[in-house]
Structures are given as C-alpha cells and as structure tokens.
C-alpha cells in the first residue's frame, strides 16, 4: 500500500496541471482515510505528524490544498490548510506558507497578521507576503524595510514575480531557502496576490532601488 502511494506521489509530482495533480492526491487520501478513524485523530490532535503512518495522508492533504489554491478554489484550500494546522501545530507540512499567500490574495490582513505572529520566522513566503500587506495597508514607505528584509532572504523573487525570469512549466519538486527554485514556487503560488493588489509596479520600482 505504501509503495502504491509513493507511486501516486511521484505521478503527482510529474504532473504539470494542478487539476491532474489533485486527482493523484485524492486517490491517496481516499485510500489512506480508511486506515484512520475519528478516535485516532482526536488522540493525536495537534501532533499528527509525530505518527509516521499518518504522514502520507497528511502530505497528500497538504498537496490537495496546494492544488486547490492554484485552481482558485480558495475557500476549500483555506479550510484544508486550517484543518492541517490544527492537526499539526508545528506545521511540519509548511501549510503556513501557501496559507499566507491565500490570505494576502483575499486581503484577509487580520488573519495574515495572526499567522505571522504564530510563525515568527524569516521565510520567503512570510516576509514577501508581509511586505505586500504593509504596502497595501500602510503604504510604500512603511513597506520598504519589509521588502528589503524579504529580498535579503531570497533576492530572486522580484525578477520572477515581474516576469523577468521565466517560470518553470511545473512546480519545483525540491528547493532550498534563497534559491531560484524557491522563488519560482513562491511566484507560481503568489503572483495573483500581487496582481490583485496592483503591487507589481511598486515592486519593480522598489526592487530596482534595492539593486542600485
């Protein structure tokens, strides 16, 4: 069974289309859900990732949420991310990153601020989305230091968001902090948020000043 799930994970990773990826994750979820009842989840609430046999199901649910986000099904994606954050309080699947983008896209600034307080970290997603929030809510001057901090963590994001660097046809399977692959994944998930709030002109101007 685990071998079959691994094959489905591989097929999901190879799929360029988020709808096709979603189908593979749904297969894993439907298969794995049969192994765990409500009592199991209640017994491990907040620490689900600590149970190794539950990790494939949790990872598949996180993958499903990412696909829903890419497909614009934001309500369903939000519900799944929040359920996973309740199940894994330490957020081992890193749902906080795409969830921060979802909140920014929707303009749910209070929710984003609460997420930033809960996870006080210098990660690409949280810093760039914090800069976007500051730009929208407080203006260019207030957002400038937040953007500088984000660029310090990953300098490749502005060029990727602005289309100066071509995006890959499918999401990177692996990435390291500060890498071009991380920037590509952030841009694939988050560009709509920046477009929605008309922030790309400011980003182009501000990133240019940072580079000069």
Regions found by a protein language model. Give the residues of each.
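Structural signature of alpha-solenoid helical repeat scaffolds
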Residues: 52, 87, 118, 179-180, ...
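Structural motif corresponding to the intra-repeat A-B loop/turn of tetratricopeptide repeats
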Residues: 15-18, 71, 106, 137-138
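Structural signature of alpha-solenoid helical repeat junctions
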Residues: 3, 20, 49-56, 73-76, ...
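TPR repeat positional signature
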Residues: 5-8, 61, 96, 127, ...
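Long, ordered, amphipathic alpha-helical scaffolds
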Residues: 132-212
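Flexible helix-coil transition and linker loops at the boundaries of alpha-helical arrays
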Residues: 1-2, 27-54, 85-87
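TPR/TPR-like (Sel1-like) alpha-helical repeat modules
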Residues: 22-36, 78, 82-91, 104, ...
């Amino acid at each position: 069974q685990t071998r079959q799930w691994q094959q489905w994970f591989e097929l999901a990773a190879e799929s360029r289309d988020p709808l096709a990826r979603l189908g593979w994750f749904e297969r894993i979820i439907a298969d794995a859900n049969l192994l765990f009842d409500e009592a199991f989840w209640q017994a491990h609430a907040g620490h689900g990732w600590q149970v190794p046999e539950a990790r494939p199901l949790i990872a598949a649910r996180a993958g499903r949420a990412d696909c829903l986000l890419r497909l614009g099904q934001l309500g369903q994606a939000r519900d799944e991310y929040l359920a996973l954050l309740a199940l894994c309080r330490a957020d081992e699947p890193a749902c906080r990153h795409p969830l921060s983008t979802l909140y920014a896209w929707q303009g749910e600034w209070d929710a984003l601020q609460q997420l930033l307080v809960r996870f006080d970290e210098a990660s690409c997603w949280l810093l760039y989305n914090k800069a976007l929030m500051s730009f929208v809510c407080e203006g260019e001057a207030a957002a400038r230091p937040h953007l500088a901090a984000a660029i310090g963590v990953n300098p490749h994001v502005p060029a990727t968001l602005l289309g100066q660097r071509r995006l890959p046809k499918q999401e990177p399977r692996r990435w390291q902090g500060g890498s071009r692959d991380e920037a590509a994944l952030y841009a694939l998930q988050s560009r709509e948020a920046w477009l929605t709030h008309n922030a790309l002109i400011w980003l182009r101007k501000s990133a240019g000043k940072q580079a000069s």
